[in-house]
């Protein structure tokens, strides 16, 4: 029996519609999650089309077996329980070397945040965990209690962009010298105590950026996204498209940079023609990110920081 898996899909129609679905095409949902994007994408396919859906969380896959049951019966969907950084390898094992489109919904899913024992949220008391793949070895407890001061400062600055990273790392170092820091509440209170009073009056939870930083470190989120998106670009067939939803500046910056590198070429100006092997493989479909509508923002608080970028394969 699976737990309730409530998840409101962000930018649902925009993400899938921008893939310009071919009814008999081969598609990938790199981040199955609540299966919202998968369900809508499958509704656009004929019996000749197929979807490969990745997720490293078994709970998400169990839920999707219920939500997508009618498509499973027709043999239109294949679930792959793995990190999407293994995209190319896992698809190759299934005989897939080219795809017509792929979508990503990066970051942690709402059900993972809401499931207290997963330890993702600073709003609920739970053991420090934060693993998207529950079989992974590194946990938030390991990071908080075993990383030295300099490594803590590094990840807090790099992944949390918190200007009080040094003070927070020092406070953690002092606290764990007395006893291990074991819960999300303990950590959140330590973070609050390291920040000046005027900072605590600002909008947003004072622990948000540090929790984000630890979560990214535990799951190597940016490294996995970097590897996977590059593989996806390579896998795309001509005119195939890639849609990526991001939820914070680090993810968006990474996606924007990868798309830029794949859609521009470094050749001298004035060349009479550009050889095929030097042509950029991608073309940006939207120069600026697509944002949620006002209606969606009012209906789904999680959508507030969402940005969608889309690109198309124009050269192999």
Swiss-Prot record:
The keyword Lipid biosynthesis does not apply. SUPFAM superfamilies: Putative methyltransferase TM0872, insert domain, S-adenosyl-L-methionine-dependent methyltransferases. GO terms for cellular component: cytoplasm. S-adenosyl-L-methionine binds at residues 35-37, 55, 84, 105, 112. Its EC number is 2.1.1.199. It is found in: Cytoplasm. It catalyses: cytidine(1402) in 16S rRNA + S-adenosyl-L-methionine = N(4)-methylcytidine(1402) in 16S rRNA + S-adenosyl-L-homocysteine + H(+). It holds the Pfam family Methyltransf_5. Keywords: Cytoplasm, Methyltransferase, rRNA processing, S-adenosyl-L-methionine, Transferase. Disulfide bonds: none annotated. InterPro entries: RsmH (IPR002903), SAM-dep_MeTrfase_MraW_recog (IPR023397), SAM-dependent_MTases_sf (IPR029063). One of its GO terms (molecular function) is rRNA (cytosine-N4-)-methyltransferase activity. GO terms for biological process: rRNA base methylation. It comes from the Bacteria. Belongs to the methyltransferase superfamily. RsmH family. Specifically methylates the N4 position of cytidine in position 1402 (C1402) of 16S rRNA. NCBIfam families: 16S rRNA (cytosine(1402)-N(4))-methyltransferase RsmH (TIGR00006). This is Ribosomal RNA small subunit methyltransferase H.
């Amino acid at each position: 029996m699976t737990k309730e898996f409530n998840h409101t899909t962000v930018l649902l129609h925009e993400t899938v519609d921008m893939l310009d679905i071919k009814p008999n095409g081969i598609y990938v949902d790199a981040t199955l999650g609540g299966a919202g994007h998968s369900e809508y994408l499958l509704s656009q396919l004929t019996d000749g089309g197929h979807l490969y859906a990745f997720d490293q969380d078994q709970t998400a896959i169990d839920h999707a077996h219920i939500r997508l049951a009618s498509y499973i019966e027709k043999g239109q969907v294949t679930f792959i329980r793995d990190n999407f950084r293994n995209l190319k390898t896992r698809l190759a094992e299934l005989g897939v070397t080219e795809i017509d489109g792929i979508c990503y919904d990066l970051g942690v899913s709402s059900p993972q945040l809401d499931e207290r024992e997963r330890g993702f949220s600073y709003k609920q008391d739970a053991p420090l965990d934060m693993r998207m793949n529950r079989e992974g070895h590194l946990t938030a407890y390991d990071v908080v209690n075993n990383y030295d001061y300099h490594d803590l400062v590094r990840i807090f600055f790099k992944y949390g962009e918190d200007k009080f990273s040094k003070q927070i790392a020092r406070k953690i170092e002092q606290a764990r010298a007395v006893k291990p820091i074991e819960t999300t509440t303990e950590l959140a209170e330590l973070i609050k105590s390291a920040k000046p009073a005027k900072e605590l009056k600002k909008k947003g939870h004072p622990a948000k950026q540090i929790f984000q930083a630890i979560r990214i470190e535990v799951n190597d989120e940016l490294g996995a996204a970097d590897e996977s998106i590059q593989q996806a670009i390579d896998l795309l067939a001509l005119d195939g498209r890639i849609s990526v939803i991001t939820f914070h500046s680090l993810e968006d910056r990474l996606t924007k940079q990868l798309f830029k590198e794949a859609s521009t070429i470094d050749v001298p100006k004035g060349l009479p023609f550009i050889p095929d092997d030097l042509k950029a493989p991608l073309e940006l479909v939207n120069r600026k990110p697509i944002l949620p509508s006002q209606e969606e923002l009012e209906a789904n608080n999680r959508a507030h920081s969402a940005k969608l970028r889309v690109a198309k394969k124009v050269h192999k």
